[in-house]
Amino acid sequence: MKAVILAGGFGTRLSEETIDKPKPMVTVGGRPMLWHIMKILDANGIREFVIALGYRGDYIKQYFLDFYAINNDLTIELATGETTIHDDDRPDWRIHLVDTGLHTQTGGRLRRLRRWVEDGTFLFTYGDGVANVDIGALVEFHRLHGKLATVTTVRPPSRFGNLALEGPQVTAFHEKSVLSEVWINGGYFILEPSAIDYISSDEAIWEREPVEGLANDGQLMGYRHPGFWSCMDTFKEKTMLEQLWGSGEAPWRIWGQDPAPMVRSVGD
């Protein structure tokens, strides 16, 4: 199964970081968010990626061209030009880097990638969200319901702490709790190629007309993910992710375990 990752946005709310790079290349723990997402998917058995480029797409291309040098220790013999790569971090990835336009909207970017995914069911997600979602269970859920689209739904963190009260007495205080009755779009869609028919133009925002159309036609199902999820829209969220990574307890760091089998397309 292929994974499509949107990586063309400007990231205006992280403007100090994104003045010279696309948002998915903002780092957490010294690694781009895009790398974290690809490692999550790799741990779930997905190793072929279609990256939708836009703003500073050249930055992403150069990162992968220099991937071995960036992610490994090197010995360079200047006299001979010989380079030795140590540690040899060589993930078994196939990466398609595709320009989808500078100002194209999220739906339009997916529409421009149609020829890259028309061979079967695929995963579609954003370049700024990490989660410990079970992709195998997500794909199985999609296979069983037989609709065109599945969205992973997550509980958003509350902006405020909440209190438990008994009369005027505060009996508990919970900081950064989740909104237990609310489910939102967490990305990590599973789509059939014909879901792209719902995208009319480059100006189409995926989360509006296309997704609303799929829902209205009964072709969108929601997979509930009760575990960890976070986007990185603000510096506050970036700081939180950095702290989790630095603690050694980042919930989305699911790799380093036994390799998962390749996730196959629905119907294989």
Cite the ranges covered by each PLM segment.
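Well-ordered alpha-helical segments embedded in enzymatic catalytic cores
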Residues: 36, 108-112, 210
